[in-house]
From Swiss-Prot:
The chain crosses the membrane at residues 11-31, 64-84, 89-109. It is a multi-pass membrane protein. One of its GO terms (molecular function) is NADH dehydrogenase (ubiquinone) activity. One of its GO terms (cellular component) is plasma membrane. This is NAD(P)H-quinone oxidoreductase subunit 3. Its main location: membrane.
Amino acid sequence: MFVLSGYDALLIFLLLSALVPVLALTISYLIRPKGSGAFRTTTYESGVDPRGDSWIQFNIRYYMFALVFVVFDVETVFLYPWAVAFNQLGLLAFIEALIFIAILVVALVYAWRKGALEWT
């Protein structure tokens, strides 16, 4: 019977995680169509010939929604470890998390009142 130590399993995982993408790229390179010419360099746009210029201005609403999403996504990243270790942490950590959430609620109310969440 082959018994792995803790680091052997990590080494096998690292090797496999490096090998799988290399193997997938190699296989796709070998079985790809071998065409050449101008058709290969055209942009694929849902099976339709592309129309218009690709450099267009996006509405600022997209950026505002993205910014608000990033703020609350980062909040989730910071609150998840706190929620996992909630039982081991004391009252001080709970109060700190409440202050953190309160600051983000104030930011959400500010964005809402400024109209950053309005689509019209």
